Amino acid sequence: MLKNDLFIRALKRQATPRTPIWVMRQAGRYLPEYRAVREKTDFLTLCKTPELACEVTIQPVDLMGVDAAIIFSDILVVNEAMGMNVEIIETKGIKLTPPIRSQADIDKLIDPDIDEKLGYVLDAIRLAKKELNDRVPLIGFSGAAWTLFTYAVEGGGSKNYTWAKKMMYREPKMAHQLLQKISDCISAYLVKQVEAGADAIQIFDSWASALSEDDYREFALPYIKQNVAAVKAAYPEIPVIAFAKDMNTILSDIADCGADAVGLGWNIDIAKARKELNDRVCLQGNMDPTVLYGTPEKIKSEAAKVLKQFGQHNDHSGHVFNLGHGILPDVDPANLKCLVEFVKEESAKYH
């Protein structure tokens, strides 16, 4: 039994005495303790060494007092498992070779055995679950098919998603074939993460806003639905968060994907999102990550604003406090600590 299950209860829109908080990229470069581990090895080796991945997963629980841990990994491990060569240089960016741009390229991608190709993530989850000793829940995650598709087709990050869009508009059948292949891998991977001990799942569609509303409904959302359905078919009790960054104009469609919670970027008032979705799902977010560059007073006032905008809870509301995207690497850890402590204290009056 979890000693602190506030995060899980909030995702399920059950009553909680206060609002739980965790932060995307909470295991990361802003922490000197993370940097000390990271200095010994490269980024992907850190992801692939269960003992080290476990250590950095737990750091923010010990140091910051967050209400959930998220397994330390990277969304691109899925691309690598499917046969792509992935290079991640934290300060310089990402390179995937060869880029997937033809039918022959798609045919070469493998349908991986998750235990074999991504066993290191599952081992890290098992280890972290054991080390956490039920203090807080552990989140497993994957990138969404659309986001992983953009990396595969572009061969890295992109401003305009030229190659990805070319395939979408010129060869939509081929695009869907690749998306489906990626989605099948994601579904299997997420189910395996729960099997290994993950208490909740988040699907990150980081590049969601590269698509128009209609294109998002066609090329992204159906695959998120598949991934959520796969988790729910195997583990109906496991809550799932869908984070389609900055797709604020179609929140209702995203809320219909079957996920328990919808993650919000910071460029929407959470009150608007709550009103539109009418407490059909839990909301996660959504303070601007750059607020953590501010003074303690400013951090508290901005956090108070998010809590106030969400407003008073009722019998079927849920809110998980988070940033609208990942914490930035040059933030002072004391500022995150300040945020976590403030949210824990301030949020009680809304419950």
Swiss-Prot record:
Q: Which residues bind substrate?
A: R25, Q26, A27, G28, R29, F43, D74, Y151, S206, H325
A Pfam family found in this protein is URO-D
Q: List where in the cell it is found.
A: Cytoplasm
Q: Which EC number(s) does UniProt give?
A: 4.1.1.37
Keywords in UniProt for this one? Cytoplasm, Decarboxylase, Lyase, Porphyrin biosynthesis
GO-annotated cellular components:
cytosol
GO molecular function per UniProt: uroporphyrinogen decarboxylase activity
UniProt-listed InterPro entries: UROD/MetE-like_sf, Uroporphyrinogen_deCO2ase_HemE, Uroporphyrinogen_deCOase
Source taxon at top rank:
Bacteria
Biological processes per GO annotation = protoporphyrinogen IX biosynthetic process
- The first-level EC class reads lyase
Q: What is its main location?
A: cytoplasm
| Tagged with keyword Disulfide bond | no
| Pathway as given in its UniProt record | Porphyrin-containing compound metabolism; protoporphyrin-IX biosynthesis; coproporphyrinogen-III from 5-aminolevulinate: step 4/4
Catalyzed reaction equations: uroporphyrinogen III + 4 H(+) = coproporphyrinogen III + 4 CO2
Which residues are listed under the site Transition state stabilizer?
D74
Subunit field text: Homodimer.
Similarity-based family:
Belongs to the uroporphyrinogen decarboxylase family.
Q: What does this protein do?
A: Catalyzes the decarboxylation of four acetate groups of uroporphyrinogen-III to yield coproporphyrinogen-III.
Protein name listed in UniProt:
Uroporphyrinogen decarboxylase
Q: Which organism is it from?
A: Chlorobaculum tepidum (strain ATCC 49652 / DSM 12025 / NBRC 103806 / TLS)
Taxonomic path: Bacteria, Pseudomonadati, Chlorobiota, Chlorobiia, Chlorobiales
